[in-house]
Amino acid sequence: AHSDRFRAGIARSGAYNRTLTPFGFQNERRTLWEAPDLYITVSPLMAAHKINEPLLLIHGEADNNPGTFPIQSERMYHAVRGNGGTVRLVMLPYESHGYVARESVEHTLYEMLAWFDKYVKNAPPRERVETGR
């Protein structure tokens, strides 16, 4: 997200702040209190101020995955926006971690295509910087 390799990004139902899952995640069994530096280091939220490309966040309003409650995307949205970044948050009603309703799937595809059309396909070209190679 804070690289020149991308023009825009899309993140769906993510875990952006690991301090919100204080009793472990994936293969990490230590708690937040046992490994606070790790929890902060692996949390994309802590790098929100570095996100310099447009970011689309999509999340199911009823996500009951303990690592990816909707508050994860809401907080990431506010962190990027609060730091001056371009960000959009789409919350899908009645959807959990995986989106199953036809309307939600179609809406997700619409949002993703519109995002890339706006920020990638129709984006003005970047200035080239000579690298001296």
List each model region and its residues.
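Active-site-proximal cap/loop segments of hydrolase catalytic domains
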Residues: 1-133
